[in-house]
Structure formats: C-alpha cells, structure tokens
C-alpha cells in the first residue's frame, strides 16, 4: 500500500470512529482528498469535509447531518446549533427535505450572511445544552423553532415527540413560547398546534395521520389502547387508534411505517 493510501486510510478511520467527516489543514492532504473525490471514492458533504463514499452511503440522512455538525463543532467550538440541526441531535422527527444546510444560532449584533452550508438565526433568551456532544438550543426552543416553520402535520409530529421526550405539559410550552417569542413568525401556529399534542403518539407517521384526521373533521381517537387477544384474553395487544361508536362498537386504526417492514426486530421473524 502506498504511503498516501495509508495516510488516507488512517485519516478516515479516525474520523469514522468519532462519527465525523475527515478534515485536514494540510494543503497536500487536501489535494489528495480532492483527487479521490474526482475518482468517486470520496464524497465532500460540505466545504472542507470529506468521507469515504462507501461509508457515507451507509448512513441515514440524520446521521449524515450529525457527522457534518460534529465536524463543524470541532472547527467552531462556540457554535450553537438550532432549528432542524438541533432537532436532529435531540432525535425529533424532522422531514428529510429540511435536512440540508446546518442551522446556527447567533445574536442581532453578530449576524452573519447565510451560505449554502450554514444558515444563521437570531436566538435570544435561551440557554444552550449539550446533546450527543453538540452545543444546541434548549429542547423547548428547538421544538418551538421547528414547529413554527412547518405545516400542521409535521408540527404535530414534533410536538407529540417533545411531550414524550421532555415529559412536560402543552400548557407549559405555550407559556414559554409567549415569553420568548410570541411575536415571531409562526408562533401562533406553534401554540395552536401544541394544544393537540399527545405524548402517547409513538411515531411521526402516527402524528401526521392524526393531524389529517383533525384537519378533515374526524372524531379524535384514543391512542395506543391495549385490547385483550381474542384467543388468549390473558394477553393483550395495543392498537394505534381506537374509536368507540355511539352503539358501543369499536373501530381500530393502524399506521404502518416503513420501519415495520424493514426492521427485522419489529417483524418478529415474519416476512
């Protein structure tokens, strides 16, 4: 193996162990990396950041975003990530369409120009926290910023997950929003949506389905209800949605996300 190949292998191995992209301040190394990019062996997710093509293709979109964020944090340790970038760190359900540039918090007096890679947002009255080794806006602020910029279905998915993750009450969130940014764009939308939030919802897909029910005027179902098994009443199973009619009969609704078909653990050996 050539010396350059050994150097590249070690560079990528160190980065991958840290779940980051490879970077280098050495111009000679960067030239070698660019040649690998031209040959299709290496990808450049962001300016100055590199990853092996085979490794990168095996990552999910959120994992790719976290790699870029960790790399950016190593270069700019004072950065605080916000909006969808912070949401990914918390594990909030975010549409992949919104995972492009990284979002960084700033102040009015220190605002920078947006670029293809970085979007800057003025964030006031918030204490940053460390999540997955990354400096991010607080959970409440992150939830608020995400909810106010997306449609009702996506906002409800974020709201449901936030209640499940943080264990708080919707009313507390609304009070917090009024204090920190009640006049910001989309604040009223975020507060209205939070009134429908339910921590019992177990996936973003279930939340989006429930949002459609609300928008179309359907009666709201009970969520995650345990019912006895017909052939073994000592055991039970849970349904995603349950409606009870006036005559006492019941209607069951299920939301099947792709994970149920792709995750062997969820299939339990079934095809």
Model regions and ranges:
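Short gly/ser-rich loop at a beta-strand->alpha-helix junction or flexible surface loop bordering the NTP-binding
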Residues: 1-186
